[in-house]
Amino acid sequence: MKKIQVVAHCLLDPETRLAGLRPVAFAAEPPIIQLLCPEAGCLGLDRWAVTKNQIDIPSYRRYCREIFSHHADLIEQFAKKGYEIEVVGVEGSPSCGIKSTTLGYTGGKIRPQDHEHVPGMGVFMEEVTGELKRRDVSFRLVEARYRIK
């Protein structure tokens, strides 16, 4: 069966990652569809770190659905042509995590904050998978890892 990878933007373009984070080791297996980065698009390249609880708001979810809608149209067509769809997210991302995300920042004045990596899916990937399920598109989830455990 032919496969197409649907990948988080920063896996192919590390310049969109939060400043100071190292690139994620990832080897693309073409053909691929590169998703837009919702954090860079919504919050900019000079953004501060965020946690899922900060971006899990209606306007950010709506933005995620909007930027994914055209990709979903294409992915649905590939699925109908028999392609296996593999969605690749990023470990620990508040937006693109598949198995793990982050929680903890509480807002307020700038000050030291603690956050933790927790089991769960990021906001963007929740919207991506929800839309693919709504369209009855079968897919497999993979999480690219960057931390040494």
Feature annotation, model-predicted:
Residues 1-5:
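Extreme N-terminal starter segment of soluble prokaryotic enzymes
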Residues 10, 90-94:
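Short, well-ordered beta-to-alpha junction loops that form the rim of enzyme active sites
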Residues 14, 95-99, 148-149:
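Short, well-ordered, mixed-charge alpha-helical segments that flank or form enzyme active sites
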Residues 15-58:
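Short, surface-exposed acidic-centric catalytic microdomains
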Residues 45-52, 57-73, 109-149:
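Divalent-metal-activated hydrolytic enzyme cores
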Residues 78-83:
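Glycine-rich phosphate-binding loop signature in dinucleotide/nucleotide-binding domains
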Residues 84-90:
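Short glycine-rich phosphate-binding loop at a beta-alpha junction
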Residues 95-113:
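Active-site-adjacent alpha-helix immediately C-terminal to a catalytic or transition-state-stabilizing loop
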